[in-house]
């Protein structure tokens, strides 16, 4: 009873298409793709910022030890 078969998935997909229409689903898919791309870009920017901050911290530490 708890298993989801291929037939059930196809029926659910057909109902979703009937309820929302293909244009709305296409728009939703594009919006979702844009959101994922933005999220990945933000994660990469955060990683680059953290690495840059860590590198500048190491350089500042080297300068302070030269005194």
UniProtKB/Swiss-Prot annotation:
One of its GO terms (biological process) is protein transport by the Tat complex. Pfam families: TatA_B_E. It comes from the Bacteria. It is a single-pass membrane protein. GO terms for cellular component: TAT protein transport complex. The chain crosses the membrane at residues 4-21. Keywords: Cell inner membrane, Cell membrane, Membrane, Protein transport, Translocation, Transmembrane, Transmembrane helix, Transport. GO terms for molecular function: protein transmembrane transporter activity. Its main location: membrane. It is found in: Cell inner membrane. Part of the twin-arginine translocation (Tat) system that transports large folded proteins containing a characteristic twin-arginine motif in their signal peptide across membranes. TatE shares overlapping functions with TatA. Belongs to the TatA/E family. TatE subfamily. This is Probable Sec-independent protein translocase protein TatE. It comes from Citrobacter rodentium (strain ICC168). The lineage of its organism: Bacteria, Pseudomonadati, Pseudomonadota, Gammaproteobacteria, Enterobacterales.
């Amino acid at each position: 009873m708890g298993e989801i078969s291929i037939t059930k998935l196809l029926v659910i997909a057909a109902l979703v298409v009937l309820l929302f229409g293909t244009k709305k689903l296409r728009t939703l898919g594009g919006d979702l793709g844009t959101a994922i791309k933005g999220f990945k870009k933000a994660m990469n920017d955060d990683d680059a910022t953290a690495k840059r901050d860590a590198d500048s911290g190491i350089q500042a530490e080297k300068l302070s030890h030269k005194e």
